[in-house]
Amino acid sequence: MFTGIVIGKGEVAEKKLKSAGVVFVIDAKHWARKVKLGASVCVSGVCLTVTRKKGRKLFFDVMPETLKKTTLGGKNSGTRVNLELTLKAGDEIGGHFVYGHVDGVGEVIRVVEQGDNKLVTIRPAPELSRFIAPQGSVAVDGVSLTVASFDRESFTVSLIPYTLEQTTLGELKVGEKVNIEADMLAKLSVK
Protein backbone atom coordinates (compact mmCIF):
# COMPACT_ATOMS: atom_id res chain seq x y z
CA MET A 1 0.00 0.00 0.00
CA PHE A 2 1.12 3.55 -0.75
CA THR A 3 0.07 7.11 0.12
CA GLY A 4 0.42 8.88 -3.21
CA ILE A 5 3.28 11.01 -1.88
CA VAL A 6 5.90 10.48 -4.57
CA ILE A 7 9.51 10.28 -3.32
CA GLY A 8 11.02 11.26 -6.64
CA LYS A 9 11.31 10.64 -10.33
CA GLY A 10 13.06 7.76 -12.02
CA GLU A 11 13.72 7.14 -15.69
CA VAL A 12 13.05 4.15 -17.92
CA ALA A 13 16.57 2.98 -18.79
CA GLU A 14 15.47 0.01 -20.86
CA LYS A 15 12.35 -1.85 -21.93
CA LYS A 16 13.01 -5.49 -22.82
CA LEU A 17 10.35 -7.52 -24.58
CA LYS A 18 9.91 -11.07 -23.35
CA SER A 19 7.56 -13.90 -24.30
CA ALA A 20 4.83 -12.69 -21.94
CA GLY A 21 5.12 -9.00 -21.23
CA VAL A 22 8.06 -6.68 -20.71
CA VAL A 23 10.94 -6.18 -18.31
CA PHE A 24 11.22 -2.52 -17.34
CA VAL A 25 14.61 -1.36 -16.14
CA ILE A 26 14.23 1.87 -14.19
CA ASP A 27 17.05 4.12 -13.09
CA ALA A 28 15.76 4.91 -9.61
CA LYS A 29 18.69 7.21 -8.80
CA HIS A 30 19.70 7.21 -5.11
CA TRP A 31 16.34 5.70 -4.08
CA ALA A 32 17.44 2.29 -5.40
CA ARG A 33 19.58 1.63 -2.32
CA LYS A 34 16.45 1.80 -0.11
CA VAL A 35 14.67 -0.90 -2.10
CA LYS A 36 15.01 -4.62 -1.42
CA LEU A 37 14.60 -7.45 -3.88
CA GLY A 38 10.94 -8.51 -3.92
CA ALA A 39 9.74 -5.12 -2.66
CA SER A 40 6.71 -3.39 -4.12
CA VAL A 41 7.28 0.00 -5.74
CA CYS A 42 4.61 2.29 -7.13
CA VAL A 43 5.76 3.26 -10.64
CA SER A 44 3.58 6.06 -12.02
CA GLY A 45 0.64 4.63 -10.13
CA VAL A 46 1.25 0.93 -10.86
CA CYS A 47 2.33 -1.44 -8.10
CA LEU A 48 5.28 -3.47 -9.41
CA THR A 49 7.64 -5.99 -7.79
CA VAL A 50 11.40 -5.53 -7.89
CA THR A 51 12.72 -8.72 -9.50
CA ARG A 52 16.37 -7.66 -9.76
CA LYS A 53 18.69 -4.81 -8.73
CA LYS A 54 21.90 -3.57 -10.30
CA GLY A 55 23.36 -0.38 -8.86
CA ARG A 56 20.80 2.41 -9.37
CA LYS A 57 18.68 0.22 -11.64
CA LEU A 58 15.57 -1.66 -10.57
CA PHE A 59 14.07 -4.41 -12.76
CA PHE A 60 10.33 -5.09 -12.96
CA ASP A 61 8.43 -7.81 -14.85
CA VAL A 62 5.25 -6.33 -16.31
CA MET A 63 2.50 -8.65 -17.53
CA PRO A 64 0.52 -8.10 -20.77
CA GLU A 65 -2.67 -7.30 -18.80
CA THR A 66 -0.90 -4.50 -16.92
CA LEU A 67 0.49 -3.10 -20.16
CA LYS A 68 -3.02 -3.10 -21.62
CA LYS A 69 -4.79 -1.46 -18.65
CA THR A 70 -2.19 1.22 -17.83
CA THR A 71 0.07 3.70 -19.57
CA LEU A 72 3.18 1.56 -19.00
CA GLY A 73 2.98 0.03 -22.48
CA GLY A 74 3.68 3.47 -23.95
CA LYS A 75 6.69 4.22 -21.75
CA ASN A 76 10.03 3.88 -23.54
CA SER A 77 13.67 4.53 -22.70
CA GLY A 78 14.14 8.07 -21.44
CA THR A 79 10.57 8.41 -20.14
CA ARG A 80 10.41 9.71 -16.59
CA VAL A 81 8.21 7.97 -14.03
CA ASN A 82 7.00 8.71 -10.51
CA LEU A 83 8.34 6.46 -7.76
CA GLU A 84 6.99 5.70 -4.31
CA LEU A 85 8.08 3.11 -1.78
CA THR A 86 5.54 1.16 0.25
CA LEU A 87 3.93 2.56 3.37
CA LYS A 88 5.44 1.20 6.57
CA ALA A 89 3.92 1.12 10.06
CA GLY A 90 4.54 4.46 11.72
CA ASP A 91 4.94 6.39 8.44
CA GLU A 92 3.00 9.60 7.99
CA ILE A 93 -0.02 9.24 5.71
CA GLY A 94 0.27 12.54 3.90
CA GLY A 95 -1.95 11.69 0.95
CA HIS A 96 -4.58 8.96 0.85
CA PHE A 97 -4.42 5.17 0.59
CA VAL A 98 -3.21 4.24 -2.87
CA TYR A 99 -3.02 0.57 -3.81
CA GLY A 100 -1.23 0.75 -7.14
CA HIS A 101 -4.16 -1.03 -8.80
CA VAL A 102 -4.93 1.32 -11.67
CA ASP A 103 -8.66 1.61 -12.41
CA GLY A 104 -8.17 3.02 -15.89
CA VAL A 105 -6.48 5.57 -18.08
CA GLY A 106 -7.44 9.20 -18.56
CA GLU A 107 -6.47 11.82 -21.12
CA VAL A 108 -5.18 15.30 -20.31
CA ILE A 109 -7.53 17.71 -22.11
CA ARG A 110 -6.42 21.05 -20.65
CA VAL A 111 -3.40 22.52 -18.87
CA VAL A 112 -3.72 26.08 -17.57
CA GLU A 113 -0.94 27.96 -15.81
CA GLN A 114 -2.21 29.99 -12.87
CA GLY A 115 0.73 31.90 -11.44
CA ASP A 116 3.19 29.28 -10.17
CA ASN A 117 0.48 26.62 -10.15
CA LYS A 118 -1.16 24.59 -12.90
CA LEU A 119 -4.73 23.43 -13.33
CA VAL A 120 -4.85 20.12 -15.18
CA THR A 121 -8.12 18.79 -16.56
CA ILE A 122 -8.38 15.07 -17.25
CA ARG A 123 -11.05 13.06 -19.06
CA PRO A 124 -11.19 9.66 -17.33
CA ALA A 125 -12.43 6.47 -18.95
CA PRO A 126 -16.27 6.68 -18.81
CA GLU A 127 -16.59 3.85 -16.28
CA LEU A 128 -14.47 5.80 -13.77
CA SER A 129 -16.57 8.96 -13.66
CA ARG A 130 -18.90 7.62 -10.97
CA PHE A 131 -15.94 7.29 -8.58
CA ILE A 132 -14.72 10.88 -8.95
CA ALA A 133 -16.15 13.55 -6.63
CA PRO A 134 -15.34 17.22 -6.04
CA GLN A 135 -12.95 17.56 -3.10
CA GLY A 136 -12.48 13.79 -3.19
CA SER A 137 -9.14 12.05 -3.56
CA VAL A 138 -7.76 10.59 -6.77
CA ALA A 139 -4.34 9.23 -7.71
CA VAL A 140 -3.01 10.45 -11.06
CA ASP A 141 0.14 8.61 -12.15
CA GLY A 142 0.49 7.60 -8.51
CA VAL A 143 0.23 11.13 -7.09
CA SER A 144 -2.41 11.73 -4.41
CA LEU A 145 -4.48 14.75 -5.46
CA THR A 146 -7.70 16.47 -4.48
CA VAL A 147 -10.33 16.91 -7.17
CA ALA A 148 -10.82 20.68 -7.50
CA SER A 149 -13.82 20.40 -9.82
CA PHE A 150 -15.73 17.73 -11.71
CA ASP A 151 -18.35 17.54 -14.42
CA ARG A 152 -19.76 14.47 -16.12
CA GLU A 153 -16.84 14.06 -18.50
CA SER A 154 -13.75 15.46 -16.78
CA PHE A 155 -12.15 16.53 -13.53
CA THR A 156 -9.59 19.19 -12.69
CA VAL A 157 -6.75 19.05 -10.20
CA SER A 158 -4.62 21.94 -8.94
CA LEU A 159 -0.88 21.36 -8.89
CA ILE A 160 1.32 23.43 -6.59
CA PRO A 161 4.98 24.20 -7.43
CA TYR A 162 6.27 21.40 -5.16
CA THR A 163 4.17 18.78 -6.97
CA LEU A 164 5.16 20.20 -10.36
CA GLU A 165 8.84 19.93 -9.41
CA GLN A 166 8.87 16.58 -7.57
CA THR A 167 6.65 14.55 -9.92
CA THR A 168 6.18 14.01 -13.64
CA LEU A 169 2.87 15.89 -13.51
CA GLY A 170 4.71 19.15 -14.18
CA GLU A 171 5.59 17.77 -17.63
CA LEU A 172 2.02 16.88 -18.66
CA LYS A 173 0.74 18.13 -22.01
CA VAL A 174 -2.68 18.04 -23.65
CA GLY A 175 -3.31 14.64 -25.24
CA GLU A 176 -1.11 12.67 -22.86
CA LYS A 177 -2.49 9.62 -21.07
CA VAL A 178 -2.31 9.16 -17.31
CA ASN A 179 -3.03 6.30 -14.92
CA ILE A 180 -6.01 6.88 -12.64
CA GLU A 181 -6.82 5.13 -9.39
CA ALA A 182 -10.04 6.28 -7.78
CA ASP A 183 -10.20 6.56 -4.01
CA MET A 184 -11.11 3.22 -2.42
CA LEU A 185 -13.73 4.87 -0.18
CA ALA A 186 -15.49 6.25 -3.26
CA LYS A 187 -15.44 2.83 -4.91
CA LEU A 188 -16.83 1.14 -1.80
CA SER A 189 -19.58 3.72 -1.35
CA VAL A 190 -20.80 3.13 -4.91
CA LYS A 191 -20.77 -0.64 -4.42
Would you name each region that the model predicts?
Residues 1-191:
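Conserved loop->alpha-helix
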